[in-house]
Amino acid sequence: MRLEVGNIFIKDIQFGDSTKVENGVLYVNKQELISELSSDEHIKSIDMEIVRPGESVRIAPVKDVIEPRVKVEGNGGIFPGFLSKVDTVGEGKTNVLKGAAVVTTGKVVGFQEGIIDMTGPGADYTPFSKTCNVVIIAEPVDGLKQHDHEAALRMVGLKAGKYLGEAGRNITPDEVKVYETKPIFESVKEYPNLPKVAYVYMLQTQGLLHDTYVYGVDAKKIIPTLIYPTEVMDGAILSGNCVSACDKNPTYVHMNNPVIHDLYELHGKEYNFVGVIITNENVYLADKERSSNWTAKMAEYLGLDGVIISEEGFGNPDTDLIMNCKKITKKGIKTVILTDEYAGRDGASQSLADADAAADACVTGGNANMTIVLPKLDKIIGHVSKDVIDVIAGGFDGSLRADGSIEVEIQAITGATSEVGFNKMTAKTY
C-alpha cells in the first residue's frame, strides 16, 4: 500500500460565515457544525469554543482528541466502519489539517478523563497545548446509560473531525509525505539482506468503557492480525476509552502514531519494516494466553528478526505486555517494549505489575504518579469542580484547591506519559 499524506499547515482557527481553509487559517461555520452534530438523540446540547496555544485556558475533562482528515483519492473514507463504509483504507491520498484538532468535553462518563492546559506547567506535558483546538462541549440527556453516553461523545468527535477535514479536500498541501509498505514477499525480495521488523500494537480492550475499535469492531472481539501501517493513518483504529488520560491513545495519536512514522524513517535503509500486528488487552487469563500465543505465532510466521511492542494503559495490561515480550523472545525474535511507569510519587516502587528477564530492552514514557501543581487559569471549558477533579484518575481528595489551582499526578494530563512516545518525556541516567 502506498499513501500520500498531504499536510495543510493550520496556524489559526476562527469562526466565520463558511467552513474553509484560507492562508493557513481554518474558518469554521459554528452554527453549521453544531447542526451537523445535534442529530444524536442522546445529546441534550452542543456548544463549541476555539482555543489556541498560550491562552490561559483549561479544558477538562477531555474525552478524545481527533485530527481533521479527508480522503482525497483511494479506497474508502476516513473512520471506516463508523463514518465511512467498511472498505480497506490506507492507500491513495489523504489531506490533513496539521496543527488543528477537535477536543471533546462535557459531562464525561466516569470522570476518568484528562486535563489539557493551554499554558503554564501543565501545557508542557500534553501535546495538545500546541494545537489550535475546536473544543466541542457535548452535554448528554438526563439518565443516559454509560455505554450510550460514551458512544454519543465518540461519534460527536468523529463527525466534527470529518466535517472539518472536508475543508482541506481541494487545498494544495504545504507538504506531502509518502508512506509505502509492499506485500510481504515483495518486501523481502526487495530488501533480502535487511532484518525484518514489525510493530506489535497493543490496543486497550479491558472493557467497561476501556475500548478501542478497528474498522468499527470492538477490538476485544478480534484475534491478533496483520494490518498495513498506512491503514492506521486513515482512521482504521480509533479510541473509545474512558481511562487514565496520561497513557491512553486518543484517536489523534492513533492517526499519528510515532512508532509507525519513525519505523518508516529507516525502512529500506537499516531494516525492512514489514507491517503492524494488532493485538488486544482483554482481562481474562484465557484471552491473554490466546492473544499472546497468536501474536508470537504471527511474528514467527512472518520470519521477523525484531519487534517493537507498545502497551496501552497499565496494571492489568502489564501482563499482556510481558506475555507478548516473553513469548516472542522465546521464538528467537528480539524485542523492545514501550510502556510507562506507576512507580509511586517518589519513583521508588515497582514500575510495572509484571516483569520477566526477557524484557531487557525497555523505553519508558515516564512515571505517571509524579505530582504537579497546575495554577488557576483564566478560563475553564468543561467541568472543573471538586466532584470532578478529586475523582479524576490521578486526582485525590483535596486536589482542587480553594484558590483554583489543582494538585494532581501527571496521570491526569492528557498524553503526559504516552506509551507510543507522543510526548516530550524521556529518561536519563546520571
Swiss-Prot record:
Modified residues (Pyruvic acid (Cys)): 242
Catalytic reaction annotation: acetyl phosphate + [thioredoxin]-disulfide + NH4(+) + H2O = [thioredoxin]-dithiol + glycine + phosphate + H(+)
Effect of residue 242 to S/T: In vitro processing occurs more slowly than in wild-type
Region forming the signal peptide: none
Active site per UniProt: 242
UniProt PTM comment: The peptide chain is cleaved into beta and alpha chains, and the alpha chain N-terminal cysteine is deaminated and oxidized to form a reactive pyruvoyl group.
Other remarks on this protein: The protein sequence in PubMed:11422384 comes from protein overexpressed and processed in E.coli.
Name of protein: Glycine reductase complex component B subunits alpha and beta
Organism of this sequence: Acetoanaerobium sticklandii (strain ATCC 12662 / DSM 519 / JCM 1433 / CCUG 9281 / NCIMB 10654 / HF) (Clostridium sticklandii)
